[in-house]
Amino acid sequence: MPLIIVSMYPGRTQQQKDEYAKAITKSAVEILKTKESHVIVVFEDNPKENWFLAGNQL
């Protein structure tokens, strides 16, 4: 059962998340040869100030 966690900046609409979750699920089904009902997608909205690259805030 794939659990796919998407971490991104806040600000996306629920419609955007719905569409993205459907696209991710479709890809997981095709690539991983699993059932749609087994794919879980979780969105984590994390403020930009929580993102760092090479020790530096983005």
Features from the language model and the residues they span:
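A domain-level signal for the structural core that forms small-molecule/cofactor-binding pockets
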Residues: 2-58
